[in-house]
Design a protein with these regions (language model features):
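Aromatic "clamp/platform" in nucleotide-sugar-dependent glycosyltransferases that forms part
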Residues: 83-88
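A general structural signal marking secondary-structure boundaries and capping sites
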Residues: 192-193, 260, 295
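Cofactor-binding loops of NAD(P)H-dependent oxidoreductases
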Residues: 49
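Oxidoreductase cofactor-interface core, primarily capturing Rossmann-like NAD(P)-dependent enzymes
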Residues: 1-27, 31-41, 52-55, 59-62, ...
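Amphipathic terminal alpha-helices
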Residues: 271-303
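Terminal hydrophobic/aromatic helix or amphipathic segment near a protein terminus
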Residues: 201, 215-262, 299-303
Length: 303
């Protein structure tokens, strides 16, 4: 039995689909059962647990031989990093109580760094705390998700401009489809044989991209020319808040992109276990037609 935390997220759902395709039993651990109907239709058992309740989470994963842990981030929480650290504590208590044979945790590029990485820093804490549990552990560090750029579809559609926190615009950086993260996780979950603990694996897409590539892809999806422009550092936090992020989260994102632009967010030095997903950034699954249509300005929808 595989227990999947964060089952309703993009990566969690992709892991579950792969496991069910291969005939494995899956228990989907969710906070809101109403969002798990499609998972139930796939044949999953559904367990409901609050990620701040260690006893409830332990009950949800009890009996599972293998657990996939995904620690969510709350962009509008007053203290997003503190909230995530609290959830990490809950997850670790549940794992110690239930002692599954194998745990895979989805982490983040740059998680080896202990300072200066903004919203990636809680993943450093996640990895450190999981190591203390003594469980057989695989750390799957994910590059930036391609799907995250959908947040800028509306801005690009309305203005013809892609404001970029990646500086310079020509700088190549790793990205990966959330679906490919889930597929890589499923492969690792079912792998057998002896392995080092923790096993460290990085996952990114088939190649690296620049902000110029992103603008070109958004332009093709939207049917108009999109120009990438470096957003001045002094404007980052205000722009992120206008985009719907809480002030604390916006500050953490800004610090992360400072680290990105300094070349710090990458495969850990000396690491060799790198999985490359097959999905290109221009794949229709990244920006489905319905998502693109919803981002179009009202005038273009009516026309």
């Amino acid at each position: 039995m595989f227990a999947i935390l964060g089952a309703t997220g993009n990566a969690g759902r992709a892991t579950i689909r792969q496991l069910r395709k291969r005939g494995f039993k899956v228990r989907a651990v969710v906070r809101d059962e109403s969002k798990a109907q499609d998972l139930e239709a796939l044949g999953c058992k559904i367990a409901v647990a609050d990620l701040h309740d260690a006893a409830a989470l332990a009950k949800a994963i009890e009996g599972a031989e293998t657990v996939q842990a995904i620690c969510p981030i709350s962009p509008r929480a007053p203290d997003p990093a503190g909230n995530m650290r609290a959830i990490v504590g809950t997850i670790c208590k549940a794992l110690v109580a239930t002692r599954p044979a194998k745990v895979l945790a989805i982490s983040d590029y740059g998680a080896e760094l202990g300072a200066g990485t903004g919203i990636t820093l809680p993943f450093h804490f996640l990895e450190a705390e999981l190591r203390k549990t003594g469980v057989a552990l695989t750390l799957l560090r994910s590059a930036e998700h391609m799907q995250n750029w959908s947040r800028l579809l509306r801005t690009a559609a309305e203005t013809g401009v892609l404001p970029s926190l990646h500086h310079p615009l020509t700088k190549l950086f790793p990205m990966v489809s959330a679906r490919d993260v889930g597929i890589a996780a499923a492969d690792l979950l079912v792998s057998s044989g002896p392995q080092a603990s923790p096993r460290l694996v990085h996952v990114e897409g088939p190649r690296r991209y620049s902000a110029l590539d992103v603008a070109e892809t958004l332009g093709l999806a939207l049917g108009r020319t999109i120009v990438a422009r470096e957003l001045p550092r002094s404007d980052w936090i205000a722009a992120l808040i206008r985009g719907g992020l809480g002030a604390s989260y916006a500050a953490l994102v800004a610090e992360l992109y400072d680290a990105h632009n300094a070349g710090l967010i990458d495969v850990e030095r000396g690491a060799t276990d790198i999985c490359r997903g097959a999905t290109e950034f221009g794949d229709p699954s990244i920006f489905p037609p319905a998502l693109v249509a919803a981002a179009a300005p009202p005038s273009s929808k009516s026309g």
